[in-house]
C-alpha cells in the first residue's frame, strides 16, 4: 500500500483529500503545516511515496517543505496544490518543482493526478481540466 502525506492548513481540504485517496486504497497521513509534516514523516515507520502539499501556508511554504523532505527521503514524489496558478506563484518567489493542481479541483481530477504522479496504471485516461469540487 502506498503512503501519501497530505499537508494543507485548511482542514477541509486535508479531510477531502484524505477521504478520496483512502477510498482509492492509499494510506493517508495528514499534517496542518510544514513543521507538522516533518514531525509526521519522522514518526511514520514506513516509506512515504508522495507528498501532496499546499504551496502557500503559514510558516514553512510547500516548496521549502518539499525540498527538505526530498533531501531526507530520496525518491519521494511531490505534487502541489494551490489556489493560485504557477505563474502567480513564481512571480511571488515560489517555484514548485513538480505538478501543481489548482484549487478548487474535482475529486476525479485529484485522483487521476495522484495516480499519474505515482505511475499507477489506473490513470490511463487523461483528465482534461480541473473544476470546483465544492
Segments from the language model and where they lie:
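Conserved acidic carboxylate
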Residues: 8
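Charged docking surfaces used in two-component/phosphorelay signaling
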Residues: 15-23
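Short hydrophobic/Thr-rich beta-strand motif most characteristic of the beta2 strand and flanking loop
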Residues: 25-32, 40
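Acidic catalytic/metal-coordinating carboxylates
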Residues: 32-36, 61-65
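Active-site beta3 strand of CheY-like receiver
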Residues: 45-52
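Active-site residues of response regulator receiver
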Residues: 54, 82
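Receiver (REC) domain active-site loop signature in two-component systems and cognate sites
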Residues: 57
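C-terminal output helix
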Residues: 105-118, 122
Amino acid at each position: 500500500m502506498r503512503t501519501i502525506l497530505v499537508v494543507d492548513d485548511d482542514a477541509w481540504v486535508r479531510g477531502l483529500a484524505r477521504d478520496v485517496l483512502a477510498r482509492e486504497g492509499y494510506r493517508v497521513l495528514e499534517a496542518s503545516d510544514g513543521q507538522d509534516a516533518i514531525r509526521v514523516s519522522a514518526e511514520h515507520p514506513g516509506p512515504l511515496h508522495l507528498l501532496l502539499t499546499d504551496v502557500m501556508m503559514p510558516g514553512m511554504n510547500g516548496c521549502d517543505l518539499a525540498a527538505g523532505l526530498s533531501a531526507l527521503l530520496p525518491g519521494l514524489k511531490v505534487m502541489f496544490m494551490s489556489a493560485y496558478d504557477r505563474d502567480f506563484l513564481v512571480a511571488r518567489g515560489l517555484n514548485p518543482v513538480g505538478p501543481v493542481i489548482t484549487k478548487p479541483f474535482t475529486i476525479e481530477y485529484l485522483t487521476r493526478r495522484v495516480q499519474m504522479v505515482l505511475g499507477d496504471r489506473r490513470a490511463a485516461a487523461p483528465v482534461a481540466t480541473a473544476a470546483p469540487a465544492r
